[in-house]
């Protein structure tokens, strides 16, 4: 029969192994969550931004962004805000032109409206116009990939991307 000291050591080893296994499971789950695509209804993807980009619209959106978004996404949208390290998955880098060119305004509006852990929903906190204003602001953080040089390269078959042949 094991002594109390042996039982205690065995119990500690089992608890340590269990804790280690749990940490591994959480990390694997979180890694898969990071790359999980947003499921956005098709009709929402097709929505066009009804808000006109004016100086006052962008100024208002900038104020909302600084109050509600910059803590995680960073002042310039790089996903490097002071609270970014506390979240897993990390906040999106809104300056990533490739990523931003893959999503429609409707998708960005949906993401702001609905949220997804750890990002909160802003549907009840902000009006539709405020959320559409944020879409305009978020779009301004990245440079569109479609430039005259890219259009010309695609036209002559030198660029590869969606809709181009390899």
Identify the function of each model-found stretch.
Residues 37-64, 148-149, 156-157, 161, ...:
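Electrostatic cytochrome c docking/interface patches
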Residues 90-106, 121-131:
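Electron-transfer interface patches adjacent to heme c in soluble/periplasmic c-type cytochromes
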Residues 73-79, 98, 113, 123, ...:
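Detector for the c-type heme attachment site
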Residues 27-57, 70-95:
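His/Cys-centered metal/cofactor-coordination and adjacent catalytic loops
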Residues 67, 89-91, 114-117, 129:
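Extracytoplasmic
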Residues 25, 110-111, 123-157:
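C-terminal capping alpha-helices of c-type cytochrome domains
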């Amino acid at each position: 029969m094991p002594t109390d000291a042996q039982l205690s050591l065995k119990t500690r080893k089992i608890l340590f192994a269990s804790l280690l296994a749990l940490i591994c499971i959480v990390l694997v789950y979180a890694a898969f969550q990071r790359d999980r695509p947003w499921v956005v209804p098709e009709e929402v993807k097709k929505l066009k931004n009804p808000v006109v980009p004016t100086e006052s619209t962008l100024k208002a959106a900038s104020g909302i962004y600084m109050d509600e978004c910059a803590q995680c996404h960073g002042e310039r949208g790089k996903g490097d805000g002071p609270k970014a390290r506390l979240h897993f998955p990390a906040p999106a880098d809104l300056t990533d032109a490739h990523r931003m060119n893959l999503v429609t305004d409707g998708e960005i509006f949906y993401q702001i409206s609905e949220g997804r852990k750890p990002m909160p929903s802003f549907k009840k906190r902000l009006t539709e116009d405020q959320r559409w204003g944020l879409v305009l602001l978020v779009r301004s953080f990245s440079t569109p990939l479609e430039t005259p040089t890219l259009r010309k390269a695609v036209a002559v078959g030198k660029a590869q991307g969606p809709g181009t042949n390899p």
